[in-house]
Amino acid sequence: MAPSHPAFQFWIHLYLWCLLLMPAVLAQQGSHTHAEDRLFKHLFGGYNRWARPVPNTSDVVIVRFGLSIAQLIDVDEKNQMMTTNVWLKQEWNDYKLRWDPAEFGNITSLRVPSEMIWIPDIVLYNNADGEFAVTHMTKAHLFFTGTVHWVPPAIYKSSCSIDVTFFPFDQQNCKMKFGSWTYDKAKIDLEQMERTVDLKDYWESGEWAIINATGTYNSKKYDCCAEIYPDVTYYFVIRRLPLFYTINLIIPCLLISCLTVLVFYLPSECGEKITLCISVLLSLTVFLLLITEIIPSTSLVIPLIGEYLLFTMIFVTLSIVITVFVLNVHHRSPSTHNMPNWVRVALLGRVPRWLMMNRPLPPMELHGSPGLKLSPTYHWLETNMDAEEREETEEEEEEEEDENICMCAGLPDSSMGVLYGHGSLHLRAMGPEAKTPSQASEILLSPQIQKALEGVHYIADHLRSEDADSSVKEDWKYVAMVVDRIFLWLFIIVCFLGTIGLFLPPFLAGMI
């Protein structure tokens, strides 16, 4: 018994309809293929691809031209050229390629190899590598009205004048000039499809951004020929993306400059100022060797980053020279140099106040008692308290004056010295002529005590001399510190102004 399921019946009917319609479809396809074959024979049977597609030789072929950019591949600053991947949109009318669609199976368009038809010899005038014309001959799209639409792709290396003054914040203006190489304006004339470059299919570059891309129509008479030749020139305004160079060039330079400033904050006693300067200079030299390939190698102008690197190099070199001078001042002493009066007045008095530097007090003045200071007179063993007691006892000593004179008269004169009250020693010969009122307080001492007191005097003089030398040395050290502080602030200001000078010109030019 045959199956009666509705689905089975549906598939049976569909199969029968396919068998009935397939011959008609195949016949129609065969007719379309046959019509396309007939159309090819009709169009290219007696077609001459070398002749201009005009009925009269005086007619002008109007070529509508447009440009679409797919990728900005590279901008070579050293070789002064721009590499782009573009599509050349060209459209013209060929009266020999017209047909009636009704006679050829309603075929309204046809795609044919571009080698079979006449095409305009549009080339890139400012080419930089020898490939002036299109190398990949794609198919052209023909329409029954005779309109030919041809969009070949091409990779061009065009000459471009690169201005790297504001590198890496630079903006370039490159052009691509297209025109017929052999036909003048009386044979071929150009029209722009669009006034701007088509950016719909543009693939963004990681280094450059297209700010503007416009085209202009020009007619020019060259020295070689009497005819006028038309061209369409496209101007690309491109701006460099500075992030890569900011991270790899500018920030390291700023850090090196900061290290140079810190040299003047490092104390001279540590002995590492010159080491730090040389280390910074060596690091900058190695850094310059590494970035030689990054900076555009051109002698037309000095790039902004090159000026900043040169500024940093001079900056570091000057810091070394100044550091050597500061160390020389720091280690001066009274035995080698005398401090001029203007240095004492300016660098020990006025300049520290301007720099807000407060010199700490000496330890004797900071911690000592007022009653324990040494006196510069011959009473150097006395204290202020002793001096007051001495003044109080002067009257008592005057009363004992006669008795002391009597005691001195009975002692030998040749081997004794005298000691004034409270330890003041005078070496003199004693005799009858010494018995005067001014010598009433003299006390005779033995030679051993005299030698001991002479030794004490020598030690005291030596200590005073060392104290004076130490004071002068401390003054020289403080002068070195003041000079360090002067150049610290000076280098901070110069570093700040140099950094502002790096960013301000491109900012004012609208490139940042």
Curated annotation (Swiss-Prot):
Disulphide bond pairs: C160-C174, C224-C225
Glycosylation sites: N56, N106, N212
Location (main, coarse): membrane
Cytoplasmic-facing ranges: 330-485
GO CC term (a single one): postsynaptic membrane
Reactions accelerated catalytically: Ca(2+)(in) = Ca(2+)(out); K(+)(in) = K(+)(out); Na(+)(in) = Na(+)(out)
GO BP annotation list: cellular response to nicotine; modulation of inhibitory postsynaptic potential; regulation of synaptic plasticity; response to acetylcholine
Bilayer-spanning residue ranges: 242-266, 274-292, 308-329, 486-504
Pfam family, one: Neur_chan_memb
CDD domains, per the entry: LGIC_ECD_nAChR_A2, LGIC_TM_nAChR
Bilayer disposition of the protein: Multi-pass membrane protein
GO molecular function: acetylcholine receptor activity; acetylcholine-gated monoatomic cation-selective channel activity; heterocyclic compound binding; quaternary ammonium group binding
Subunit (UniProt): Neuronal AChR is composed of two different types of subunits: alpha and non-alpha (beta). CHRNA2/alpha-2 subunit can be combined to CHRNB2/beta-2 or CHRNB4/beta-4 to give rise to functional receptors. Both CHRNA2:CHRNB2 and CHRNA2:CHRNB4 nAChR complexes are heteropentamers with two subtypes: LS (low agonist sensitivity) with a (CHRNA2)3:(CHRNB2/4)2 and HS (high agonist sensitivity) with a (CHRNA2)2:(CHRNB2/4)3 stoichiometries; the subtypes differ in their subunit binding interfaces which are involved in ligand binding.
Known role: Component of neuronal acetylcholine receptors (nAChRs) that function as pentameric, ligand-gated cation channels with high calcium permeability among other activities. nAChRs are excitatory neurotrasnmitter receptors formed by a collection of nAChR subunits known to mediate synaptic transmission in the nervous system and the neuromuscular junction. Each nAchR subunit confers differential attributes to channel properties, including activation, deactivation and desensitization kinetics, pH sensitivity, cation permeability, and binding to allosteric modulators.
Protein family: Belongs to the ligand-gated ion channel (TC 1.A.9) family. Acetylcholine receptor (TC 1.A.9.1) subfamily. Alpha-2/CHRNA2 sub-subfamily.
Protein name in the entry: Neuronal acetylcholine receptor subunit alpha-2
Name of the coding gene: Chrna2
